[in-house]
């Protein structure tokens, strides 16, 4: 596999370890995500998938390791990153409208002193239309379905016009129409040169939705192009041998980072 310079990686993680009450949650994690790809993080419950996103964004203290975004510390590139959290992490009863939630996405570029102007408000309306929620502009978010709520948060991320998007289980609990809308949005963002890192749980759609995959179970099991890394061997190792063998495309291992090359594997 051809070498890629550090500055060509959207995300580079080296030797990251994170513990909670002295129990490792992530252990000796290395990640390399090239720019302009859609990469899934998959693994069983408790594997550390959401934790890895938060660790990269500096939301959790590291026991050791280094994180770089576009070749620099995350704190230096924070404004180039957008985050879509799990729906369960959001207080949907907060009294605010669809438009106001999406408009919040502009605060990162404006700061907390400047107020959104005509340009920002027009972009918020455009993003709401882009995710198919134009008819719900003034609707309270508490009145929306789960799929509609997810679309609103995707619109807020669009307003940020980030270069790197972190999405934590965006497909969880949504209807089929919303799922396809999310897939279309991911591919649209990729077409604009954006990079997307998505925590994902449905193994049946990995090969269809993503370019690359990171298999995680406290440690990195493998990372690379879907055709190379999403194989029966690596997935069974990540999930403890509990997965049907009918899921996997036949590929090669030329473009895959195998954790066994430099560390012990679960």
UniProtKB/Swiss-Prot annotation:
Part of an ATP-driven transport system TroABCD for zinc. This is Zinc transport system ATP-binding protein TroB. One of its GO terms (molecular function) is ATP hydrolysis activity. It comes from Treponema pallidum (strain Nichols). PROSITE patterns: ABC_TRANSPORTER_1, ABC_TRANSPORTER_2. ATP binds at residues 43-50. Coiled coil: none annotated. Residues 11-243 form the ABC transporter domain. Keywords: ATP-binding, Ion transport, Nucleotide-binding, Transport, Zinc, Zinc transport. Belongs to the ABC transporter superfamily. GO terms for biological process: zinc ion transport. It comes from the Bacteria. It holds the Pfam family ABC_tran.
